[in-house]
Regions:
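Iron-associated oxidoreductase/ferritin-like identity signal
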Residues: 1-152
Length: 152
């Protein structure tokens, strides 16, 4: 990136992504410990997989920060304990988290467009992944046979 202001904006956006993804690690790990009932095993496995993927996403964002000469954040994104552990509540909170992460990647894309092919491609790749996560959670929240996207 040529412009120092844009470089700083990109590093800040990447740090926000890293923080959001690290919050996802904690969130999904917590959820995996709070699932009970007949469907526990596949749901716990799915949640643990999301925690692992969030960690990989955080690491990738951190690598981008250092590639640009920045310092990766030690902060973690917002974590609110709702004390609701019904699987529907967990999935609704997961959907909000995924949408929030998606917004962070869109913010990065706006900064990168026309300034860095590397960051543009990274942001686009991650937007695709996050949109797939949003869709997956949305489908899990639907009643069997519902074709319309879930809306609260």
């Amino acid at each position: 990136m040529k412009d120092k202001k844009q470089l700083k904006q990109a590093i800040n956006a990447l740090n926000r992504i890293m923080e959001a993804e690290l919050a996802g690690v904690v969130r999904y790990t917590h959820y995996s410990l709070m699932v009970f009932g007949y469907n526990r095993i596949p749901i716990v496995s799915w949640l643990k997989g999301n925690a692992e993927e969030s960690l990989q996403h955080a690491q990738k964002a951190g690598e981008m920060v250092t590639l640009l000469g920045g310092h990766p954040s030690l902060k973690i994104g917002a974590l609110l304990e709702t004390e609701k552990h019904d699987i529907g509540d967990i999935l609704r909170e997961s959907l909000e988290h995924e949408k929030s992460a998606l917004a962070c990647y869109h913010d990065l894309l706006k900064i990168a467009e026309g300034n860095s092919v590397l960051l543009e491609e990274y942001a686009r790749e991650m937007i695709v992944k996050e949109e797939m996560h949003v869709d997956e959670v949305n489908k899990m929240l639907r009643r069997p046979g519902d074709l319309e996207p879930f809306q609260e």
